[in-house]
UniProtKB/Swiss-Prot annotation:
CDD domains: Ribosomal_uS17
Cellular component GO terms held in the UniProt record: cytosolic small ribosomal subunit
Protein's gene: RpS11
A GO BP entry: translation
Organism of this sequence: Drosophila pseudoobscura pseudoobscura
Name of this chain's protein: Small ribosomal subunit protein uS17
């Protein structure tokens, strides 16, 4: 059963929790729906075996990944199920024929399938429909970051 820590009963869409049990079956199987997002990304083991309920998860929810696939570095993990990533890039200034450093911060939905996302990790994100006012991307893969490094670094 899922963790019930909200006011409304948490259940996965499309799963009947009141299903009749076949006679002679003793092992109770956890009813869970998951799918493959495609694009070469593997479904995390936590999404298959876990008990979390997240309607915005690309594996267990009703969100489709389409559009852009981007990479960024985790900056903040203080929100619930949402992280802030930083994307660094270079902008060319024609007057001086030089590049200047710029960056963008993006709010990204992080599924509970990724338990230990920390500051400095490199994440791959995929575009989806708008999930809130500022969130339009979902975390698809997490690579652990290397300890101390420069603040501006192109992957």
């Amino acid at each position: 059963m899922a963790d019930q820590n909200e006011r409304a009963f948490q259940k996965q869409f499309g799963v009947n929790l009141n299903r009749k049990v076949k006679p002679g079956v003793t092992k109770k199987k956890i009813l869970r729906r998951y799918r493959d997002v495609g694009l070469g990304f593997k479904t995390p083991r936590e999404a298959i075996d876990g008990t979390y309920i997240d309607k915005k998860c690309p594996w267990t929810g009703d969100v489709r990944i389409r559009g852009r696939i981007l990479i960024g570095v985790v900056r903040k993990t203080k929100m619930q199920r949402t992280i802030v990533i930083r994307r660094d890039y270079l902008h060319f200034v024609r007057k001086y024929s030089r590049f200047e450093k710029r960056h963008r911060n993006m709010s990204v939905h992080c599924s509970p399938a990724f338990r230990d996302v920390e500051h400095g990790d490199i994440v791959t994100i995929g575009e989806c429909r708008p999930l809130s006012k500022t969130v339009r991307f979902n975390v698809l893969k997490v690579n652990k970051g290397q300890g101390a490094k420069k603040s501006f670094k192109k992957f």
